[in-house]
Amino acid sequence: MYETPPSEVLQRGHDFWNLIYGKISKRILSQMDRCGTEDLGLTVRLMYGHILSNTNVLSPVETSYVLIAGLIPQDVNPQLKGHLRGAINGGASVEEVRAVRGIVMDICEASGMRRLSDDGSGGLGWRSEVATV
């Protein structure tokens, strides 16, 4: 882990970020840098560099699947949309991404999650339809 120079780790993360977000990558990172949440841009750079772009265990596509699986139960459609598209940008097929989404939805629903009422009350679930590709 520590054999790779920090500059290479950060570049690897930058390259993976660009792969996932494609033509909107600069805009999204700029928004994170300016959003008012201290160090969000730095945190993203470090997470992508040290964790998400490391392909020693998972491929980029498999990493995208893990991210999709983590985002669906959190009800964060804007982030989920980016990672659904990012999985395709990284080499997954639309059918594969839909299959991963479907399995995760089945697991969430089996765990008691559901579409919430319009006022957002009523337990664990989603405030709107879960994003898809």
Which residue stretches match the model-derived regions?
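Extended intrinsically disordered, low-complexity coil regions enriched in Ser, Thr, Gly, Ala
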Residues: 76-106
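Short helix-coil transition sites and intra-membrane helix breaks within transmembrane domains
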Residues: 73-78, 113
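Acidic, glycine/proline-rich low-complexity segments that act as flexible tails and inter-domain linkers
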Residues: 1-60, 94, 109-133
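A short, ordered amphipathic alpha-helix with a cationic face
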Residues: 37-38, 71-75
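Short, structured motif recognition centered on aromatic/hydrophobic residues
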Residues: 62-72, 104
